[in-house]
């Protein structure tokens, strides 16, 4: 944990999770009494946990929005998201000179296996390859949103 304080789960914050289903309610606070701000409609979307209670996770999404979701709609499986309007090349190896196996379309998701030395190994069906870590959302080690910020749309 960056500040050394224990979390309710014992896991580090920030950390990456994905949304389990294509219908996840984003709330203003950590509880069913809080207003639903919007609904996520994309299963496997990577989001960053920036704070938590025992039952609720405060998340930062690819658009910089902050909201609370219940722990049961979160998964520890990893994916990355092409947040840009350009295709991201999926290479055979960890160099830009290696063969391009596929292209990740803008605003697309792909499963993440691991990241090392600035490259992330990704997979979709039988295809496996490497993308540059800086080209996708879902790998950053630092908090992307301020945990003290109230829930609401991105500020950018």
Annotate each predicted stretch with a short phrase.
Residues 1-28, 39-43, 50-53, 60-65, ...:
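SH3-family beta-barrel domains
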Residues 32-37:
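Short boundary/loop segments of OB/S1/cold-shock single-stranded nucleic-acid-binding domains
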């Amino acid at each position: 944990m960056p500040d050394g304080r224990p979390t309710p789960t014992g896991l580090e914050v920030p950390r990456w999770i994905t949304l389990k289903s294509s219908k996840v309610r984003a709330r203003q606070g950590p509880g069913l009494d809080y207003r639903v701000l919007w609904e996520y409609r994309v299963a496997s979307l990577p989001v960053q946990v920036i704070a938590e209670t025992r039952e609720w996770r405060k998340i930062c999404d690819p658009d910089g929005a902050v909201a609370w979701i219940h722990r049961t709609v979160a998964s520890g499986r990893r994916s990355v998201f092409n947040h840009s309007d350009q295709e991201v090349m999926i290479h055979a190896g960890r160099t830009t000179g290696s063969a391009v196996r596929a292209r990740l379309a803008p605003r697309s998701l792909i499963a993440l296996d691991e990241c090392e030395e600035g490259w992330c190994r990704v997979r979709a069906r039988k295809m496996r390859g490497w993308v540059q870590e800086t080209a996708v959302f879902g790998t950053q080690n630092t908090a992307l949103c301020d945990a003290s910020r109230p829930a609401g749309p991105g500020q950018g």
